[in-house]
Each structure stands twice: as structure tokens, then as C-alpha cells.
Amino acid sequence: MKILDKNKPIFYVGDHHGNWGQLFWFTDRLKIENCYLISVGDSGIGFKPQKEQLIDIKQLNKKFKKHDIIFMSIRGNHDDPSYYNGTDRIELSNFETIEDYTVMEHNGKLIQFIGGATSIDRSMRKEGVSYWSGEGLNFNGDKLQKVDTLITHTAPTWCFPQRFNKMVYDWAKDDGYLLEELTLEREVMGEIFKVCQPSLHLYGHFHDSWNEEVNGCKHRLLNINEIWTAFE
């Protein structure tokens, strides 16, 4: 288990879809430094050819190091899963991708990270270029454990949004299994919560901002580029 530096606070950021310039604009504006910045997914990693992508990541690592920020990210549905596990996982001094079910400790509290979600517009995307068949939530009950904080990309059924919007139904017209898979994915998240029992949960994916306490857990949905810390 990785133990994070207790002297560095953790900031969390919502989906930014590879718009690193805008992300740095926000970190500069908020004077964020000497910290961990953890993305709840959709960092846009994998949309470029591998050689170009790795060059970009090395440059980003240098920039985060200059800002004294250690950036880490779980995978979203708009990330190539291969960069998040195995030998291709990114682990540089100031830039790291987090494998599903990883547990870290910060100031005595346990944090578990579980990425993945289903793209509602997958029917118009190109496999291996802008869509990856392994994008969804992968359930592994053996790796779950009780933690204080749970970081995911999608969320259980009781979290916002509780209903499908018109956009989802429109995409479902060209994707016969979409509604079924979206429903199952969120139900599986509910099973994950039964084991993890976190008191704090952060997620992204839905491009909105929401927070509410449900069954003793504070849930917070981070909007695009929204940055939040428990110490604000």
C-alpha cells in the first residue's frame, strides 16, 4: 500500500478531457502547489499515438514538478485502460496513473480508487482511437476493502443523476444494450459500497456538480475542471 506524504494536502479535480492548459490555468489561479492533485477520471490519456502520448506525459510531469504538484488519475471512460495497469502504467515523479482497486493511505485514512464507466456515445467512436472496449467498471470483489474515502468515475444509483436524460435516450436508439449496461454498472457500484462503506465519496463522469449525504456517506460529484479539497 502506498503511503502519501501527510504534509501534502490532497486536491481532487473533475473530468478535464486532456485540456491541460485549462487545468494549469485553474491551479495557477487558485495558487495550488505542494500537494497531490487527483483526477476522478477522463484525463484524456490515450487519444494520441503512443509515442506522442508518452512525450506529452513527460512534459506534463516536468510542468507539475515545477508547480510542486504530484498529479494522479484514475481512469475514466475517456482514457485508454492500458495506461492504467501492467507494464504500461505511468509512474513518474509527478505524474501517475492509478490502477483500479489501488488503496493508499493519507494522514491515517484509507482511500480506494476504482475507475471506469460506459460511454453513452460509444456507437459513434472508433475502437482503439477514441473508445476502448475495456472502458467500463470492472468488478473485483476480492480487492475491495473497508476504507474512509472512495474515489470512482461513475456512481451508485442513489447518487445524482438518478435518471437518464434525453441525451442518453437519444444515443440508446443506436445502441441496443446501452441502457441495460448503464443500469447494471451503477447497481454494481452499489455492491461496491456495501463492502467499502466510505464516509466520503468523490466521482465525476456526469459533468455536473452535486453533493449530498446519503446513509452516512458524503457524496460529491465534481464538474468539469472543478477542484475540491476536504480542507477548504
Q: Where are the regions a protein language model picked out?
A:
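Core catalytic region of metal-dependent phosphoesterases/phosphodiesterases
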Residues: 3-9, 13, 18-106
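Active-site-proximal beta-strand elements of phosphoester/diester hydrolases
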Residues: 7-17, 108-117, 148-153, 218-223
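Soluble or luminal CAZymes and related metallo-dependent hydrolases
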Residues: 18, 22, 52-59, 130-143, ...
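Flexible loop residues that form catalytic
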Residues: 42, 155, 206
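Conserved catalytic scaffold of divalent metal-dependent phosphoesterases
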Residues: 45, 72-177
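A short helix->loop->beta-strand "cap" motif at the edges of active sites that frequently abuts
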Residues: 66-71, 196-199, 217
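Binuclear metal-dependent phosphoesterase catalytic core
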Residues: 104-107, 191-195, 207-232
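Proline-aspartate-enriched helix->loop->beta-strand connector
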Residues: 147, 151-152, 169, 189-203
